[in-house]
Amino acid sequence: MRESEASIRGRVMRDLIAHVTNDHLIGKKIKNGELRKKIGDSEPPWKCPDCFSLDVIEMDNFSMEYLQAKENPNTEKVILQLHGGGYVGAMRNAYRMFAGLYCEVSHGMSVLTPDYRVAPEHPYPAALEDAYAAYCYLLEQGWFSEQIIIAGDSAGGGLAMALCHYLKDHGKQLPCGIVAMSPWTDLAASGESYETNFERDPLFGKTRDSLIYNKDYIGDNDPYNAYISPLYGDFRGFPPMLIQVGSYEMLLSDSVDVAAKAREQGVKVRISIYEGM
């Protein structure tokens, strides 16, 4: 899809989200994550499409779901999907659907999605520990690091980069690529777009009570810690990154600043900014 085409659809979606998130309706509960938690608790069991198989893997502190194509699976690469949710929302059916989409657009790559622990019950470093355990699981299953692609949106996109900082600092091999959609990379909320898009962001804007100001995950830790806010880490040696973000998002700076810093440090980065989204 061309960015111009996406922008037209994006404007329609933006206006719809802005209406739904009106504080007089249910906006506050959407923005602060309360509705997400309630929906997550009440979601019906997900029915896996017949073209896929889905296995649940129990780890010590969390579970994971491994989705595979039944016909012609791609055995060259595997995707580790890290879900979003502001580090306070557990995995939802939407991410099971995302796993299927990832499998389809990648011509059959399998997708591992950890339902990592979230705050406030499990603040930092729980999510990072579980993401690392999921990565190690793939290695233990015979995958090589150069076969692993890490994908994530929002908190999941930031967690993908935080995981790579952790892997590099601990002498581990990094994945072959990162796909990040609207990654949350600056939990210190210091970027320009936190102010310039405050009135325009239909999902998180116009309130300081939204998920992106929630401190449950950070706790008493330093928000400038690269394992919490990957923007502040050293990107040298990182794999190629694909970053996608909307121009109206408060998280725009999180993407733009990461892309600029990573490029300066020799990383191959492609960033797509979709106007009006």
Which residues does each PLM region occupy?
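N-terminal targeting or regulatory segments adjacent to alpha/beta-hydrolase or S9 domains
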Residues: 1-45
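Alpha/beta-hydrolase superfamily serine-hydrolase fold, recognizing
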Residues: 9, 19-22, 46-48, 53-277
